């Protein structure tokens, strides 16, 4: 995975979040709930689309078309997801 430029986290932390999400089905329930909560907080009405962005290998374009949402909206939500992952509650 290469570093996503617009996200203010080092490549290692971005990779940690991305690869954790890609293993969603094998994760403990509390981590799955964290991912779902962050999708709801960062994605709002588009939380299902954001979940697909984070937990599948599909392109943002394909997900945006299927969910009738702009790509830029998903990119903003994805950025917020990454930032919130490390925020203390």
Where are the model-predicted features located?
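Flexible domain-boundary/linker segments
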Residues: 52, 66-67, 80
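C-terminal flanking helix
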Residues: 82-89
């Amino acid at each position: 995975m290469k570093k996503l430029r617009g996200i203010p986290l080092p490549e290692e932390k971005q990779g940690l979040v991305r690869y954790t999400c890609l293993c969603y089905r094998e994760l403990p329930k509390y981590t799955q709930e964290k991912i779902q909560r962050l999708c709801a907080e960062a994605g709002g009405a588009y939380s299902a689309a954001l979940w697909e962005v984070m937990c599948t290998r599909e392109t943002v374009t394909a997900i945006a078309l299927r969910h009738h949402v702009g790509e830029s909206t998903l990119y903003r939500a994805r950025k917020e997801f990454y930032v919130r992952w490390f925020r203390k509650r």
